[in-house]
């Protein structure tokens, strides 16, 4: 069975990035280095440009100027998987067929063994033939996570993927994501300071002046909700966010 991520994944290098949409300049001369093989969370005020930055990194929105590449100097094109807030499962397909969607879109034969392995990893083996409408929100996000991993891409971009879930389900899916995404380069956008501190190796805060790093986090993710270090990190992060919001 193929592993989730065989080779050392690249980091993400953003250099002198500028983006203007219409008459609004979202960011200018932005520089950013995201460590390969680690989980990095990006937070900030609403409208700071977090989702726009992620879309530029993903190649969905062209930048006005600047350069984005892997830390190995190669383009990130073809090496990125995406997971958003909406699961975007096709209702007429089974869960297994949704997981294999990338193969279908490429006109390739589905790797059912790989899909079944991933469904087992996310606890959905018994739901492989079910339709999305029969699953809970948490189960659908598990399926979306398996679909993200199916492509075997080393870089995973996540735009608030857990925000629509109830607290307990969100905690469970956070833990699962931290476990199955080990060895990937992950960039997570979130407004939840606790989620960011629980899941991440590195924290970044985006404001009108650019992006700044937060103090290092203690321990390894996923951290327990009552971990003393997590609580201290969350307090420091909230203070930092309050500062950029002024």
How should these model regions be labeled?
Residues 93-100:
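Short coil-to-helix segment of the ABC ATPase nucleotide-binding domain corresponding to the Q-loop/switch region
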Residues 65-80:
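Conserved ABC transporter NBD signature motif
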Residues 43-45:
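The feature captures the beta-strand-to-loop junction immediately N-terminal to the Walker
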């Amino acid at each position: 069975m193929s592993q989730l991520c065989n080779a050392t994944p690249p980091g993400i290098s953003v250099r002198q990035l500028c983006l203007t949409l219409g008459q609004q300049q979202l960011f200018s001369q932005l520089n950013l280095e995201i460590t390969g093989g680690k989980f990095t969370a990006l937070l900030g005020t609403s409208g700071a440009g977090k989702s726009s930055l992620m879309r530029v990194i993903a190649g969905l929105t062209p930048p006005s100027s600047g350069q984005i590449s892997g830390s190995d100097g190669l383009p990130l094109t073809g090496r990125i998987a995406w997971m958003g807030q909406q699961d975007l499962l096709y209702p007429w397909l089974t869960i297994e067929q949704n997981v294999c969607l990338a193969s279908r879109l490429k006109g390739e034969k589905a790797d059912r063994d790989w899909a079944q392995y991933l469904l087992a990893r996310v606890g959905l083996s018994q739901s492989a033939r079910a339709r999305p409408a029969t699953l809970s929100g948490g189960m659908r996000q598990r399926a979306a996570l398996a679909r993200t991993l199916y492509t075997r891409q080393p870089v995973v971009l996540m735009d608030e993927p857990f925000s629509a879930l109830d607290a307990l389900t969100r905690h469970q899916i956070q833990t699962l994501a931290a476990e199955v995404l080990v060895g990937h380069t992950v960039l997570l956008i979130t407004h939840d300071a606790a989620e960011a501190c629980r899941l991440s190796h590195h924290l970044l805060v985006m404001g009108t002046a650019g992006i700044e790093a937060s103090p290092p986090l203690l321990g390894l993710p996923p951290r327990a909700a009552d971990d003393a270090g997590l609580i201290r990190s969350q307090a420091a992060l909230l203070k930092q966010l309050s500062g950029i919001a002024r």
